[in-house]
Design a protein with these regions (language model features):
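Cofactor-binding active-site loop characterized by glycine-rich and histidine/acidic residues
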Residues: 57, 65-74, 83-205, 230
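Charged, glycine/proline-rich intrinsically disordered loops and linkers
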Residues: 12-46, 123-141, 252-278
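Glycine-rich ThDP/TPP pyrophosphate-binding loop and its adjacent helix/strand module
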Residues: 143, 147-318
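A short, flexible low-complexity segment enriched in Lys/Arg and Gly/Pro that occurs
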Residues: 49-61, 136-137, 277-285
Length: 318
């Protein structure tokens, strides 16, 4: 993501009104971004492995990060860093057509509001432009600091750590032909409720698997630091398998870094264009595979490991 301020374009879509900074044109935009792959008659990517699908997922992830900054900056309030680590996974699942997404991370509210803005859900409450969204953030008549299930497009509230999976499990039980992803943060994973809930549900309803935990593993948390920062990939994957998950789809940003000195928790947004495409392609492939398995009777989870604050902080959120 560019930090350079550019002049305002002569023309831009009406919903962009209120955006304060514009970057140079994204690489390959004319070849891979000229025509949207999604539309009124195409709610999901027709081919998740295509170069255009990967490219447009990358654009969506950066759009989510940028809008999150716009929203939090408007009122000098909110937490953009945590959601930024999950933006790639959220974008991938949305473009794959899986939009019944909940979270246990109340601080991710600005990112989820940004997703609802991009899919036009917020138009039902009179939010049509970026300026509208900035104005209505952190207002009683608008977008609350923590998620509210009363916001169009959102299925459930979020706030207390470790509580979001209950909503995903309930949705999966009631609507077994749909996928219910739930994003889980580092802090939330340290709460006992999450794995306990998954275990109890699997015991009671072993045939209901259409939920997908999405762990945002970024190495920082307000609590439970030892668990999130000291484990390696093998131990993390083993932890989920030990709790009965059939498949663990783990994508580590460091594996795609184009510099030899990438830290353990790498920031994918600092990679070159080719490396960013490779990382996004891996996210999209893993999200697609995990989703298909969850909808086919196998317990699956998706783990994305990268630096907290990826793309919205100069050196990550600490």
């Amino acid at each position: 993501m560019s930090a350079q301020m550019q002049s305002t374009p002569e023309t831009f879509p009406a919903f962009c009104e209120g955006i304060q900074y514009f970057a140079d044109s994204f690489p390959e935009i004319d070849r891979l971004g000229a025509e949207p792959l999604l539309g009124p008659d195409q709610p999901a990517l027709p081919d998740a492995s295509s170069e255009a699908a990967i490219y447009q997922t990358l654009l969506a992830a950066d759009a989510l990060r940028y809008l999150t900054l716009q929203v939090t900056g408007a009122k000098s309030s909110g937490h953009p860093g945590g959601f930024a680590s999950s933006a790639d996974a959220v974008a991938a699942l949305h473009l794959l057509g899986h939009r019944n997404m909940v979270t246990e991370v109340g601080h991710h509210a600005p990112g989820f509001y940004s997703a609802m803005f991009l899919d036009t859900s917020l138009e039902d409450m009179g939010i049509h432009t970026v300026s509208d969204m900035r104005t209505r953030f952190r207002e009683r008549h608008g977008l609350l600091g923590h998620l509210s299930g009363a916001i169009p497009g959102l299925l459930a509230p979020a706030g207390p750590l470790g509580q979001g999976q209950h909503f995903a499990l309930a949705g999966a039980y009631l609507h077994r032909d749909k996928l219910f992803p739930v994003t889980i943060g580092d802090g939330g994973l340290g709460e006992p409720y999450i794995m306990s809930a998954f275990q109890h549900f699997a015991t009671a309803y072993p045939d209901v698997t259409n939920y997908l935990p999405v762990l945002v593993w970024n190495g920082y948390s307000q609590e439970h630091h030892s668990m999130v920062s000291l484990w390696d990939n093998g131990r993390m994957a083993g932890y989920w398998r030990a709790h009965g998950f059939d498949e663990v789809h783990l994508v580590d940003a460091r594996d795609f870094a184009d510099t030899p000195d990438a830290p353990v928790y790498a920031d994918s947004t600092t990679f070159g264009f080719a490396a960013r495409m490779a990382f996004t392609g891996a996210i999209l492939k893993a999200a697609d595979a995990a989703s298909r398995s969850a909808l086919s009777g196998r317990r699956a989870c998706l783990i994305v490991k990268q630096l907290k604050g990826a793309g919205v902080h100069a050196t990550g959120a600490k």
